[in-house]
């Protein structure tokens, strides 16, 4: 995997050159994905906003994610992450959206998944999703690994569209 600084610069270069925008919904990373995107000079030309709907109760207000929206989707599934990404993209009116849902730990087995489990969805000109398992139960370490994985997936998808 590329170094995170290189990935962030690559994302910024592509988005700026194509005049495209991105928004983020993240739960277990607590803003780390958004912070990474904002850390690059020029971020105001591509970063529209991010939300951290950590409590389920705010997802409806912030993203129009309701029980009916996700009825039939398994928690922590790639389909669930894609639903969040698509709603984020639509709600924030961006070209791209990144959604991350995860269990950072150290407590376990939420929805039957162990700490270190995460799903990422990318919605945009091309969509992609991934299930990530770190095998770790250290909260801060998982948060950073989830962030890096989400940004790497986004950079890969952007590159595929670029070529």
Label the model's feature ranges.
Residues 1-163:
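Short alpha-helical segments enriched in small residues
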């Amino acid at each position: 995997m590329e170094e995170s600084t290189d990935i962030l610069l690559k994302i910024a270069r592509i988005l700026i050159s194509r005049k495209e925008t991105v928004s983020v919904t993240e739960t277990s990373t607590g803003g780390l994905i958004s912070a990474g995107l904002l850390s690059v000079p020029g971020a105001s030309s591509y970063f529209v906003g991010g939300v951290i709907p950590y409590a389920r109760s705010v997802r409806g207000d912030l993203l129009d994610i309701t029980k009916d929206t996700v009825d039939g989707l398994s928690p922590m599934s790639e389909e669930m992450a894609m639903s969040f990404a698509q709603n984020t993209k639509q709600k924030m009116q961006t070209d791209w959206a990144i959604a991350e849902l995860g269990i950072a730990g150290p407590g376990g087995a939420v929805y039957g998944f162990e700490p270190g489990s995460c799903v990422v969805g990318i919605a945009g000109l091309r969509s992609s999703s991934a299930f990530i398992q770190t095998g770790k139960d250290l909260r801060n370490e998982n948060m950073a690994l989830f962030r890096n994985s989400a940004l790497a997936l986004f950079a890969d998808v952007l590159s595929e569209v670029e070529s």
